[in-house]
Amino acid sequence: MLYLVPTPVGNLDDMTFRAIDTLNICDVVLTEDTRTSGKLLKHFNIDKPMWAFHAFNEHKALKSIIDHLHQGKNIALISDAGTPGISDPGFLLVRACVDEGIKISCLPGPTAFVPALVASGMTTDKFFFEGFLPHKKGRQTRLKFLADMPATIILYESPHRLVKCLEEIRDFIGET
């Protein structure tokens, strides 16, 4: 079975008991970055093999992981912070598991955008999660599309591009 296990976003005390128990029963933990995940696993005394699984190797690693799942291995997928598959690796693996009839268990847990949305004071009854905007090609087209969205828009952006992104959004949407 594939387990999608959310990890804390900034505070290790947010790790759930169920997430710890799940990681302990798995044969292997797929990690976005073994250094970051190694610290997390060590903190909770979880001694499991870690396999790197990230945007640069997920296509190549997919077949081997699916083979191990078909052999009955329990495999957990974690990201550096938050829920795997939300602007992190995981979609291709989940899709392959669905296509192959492999059971998936997705644990509830942290995502960065939910607390940010709730604490923003913006309307939460309708929102659109865009994730990361394209870096170059298609960025302006995407912003134009989002400008007409009748909902709160949620974007992810890296700290070093944040000011530029906010300026671009202001140019398309205006100051509201």
Give, region by region, the residue ranges found by the protein language model.
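Loop/turn-to-beta-strand initiation segments
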Residues: M1-L2, G72-A76, T152
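Short glycine-rich anion-binding loops that position phosphate/pyrophosphate groups of nucleotides
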Residues: V9-L12, D80-P84, P159-R161
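Short active-site oxyanion
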Residues: L23-V29, I102-I104, T152-I153
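Beta-strand/loop-alpha-helix module characteristic of Rossmann-like adenine-cofactor folds
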Residues: T111-T176
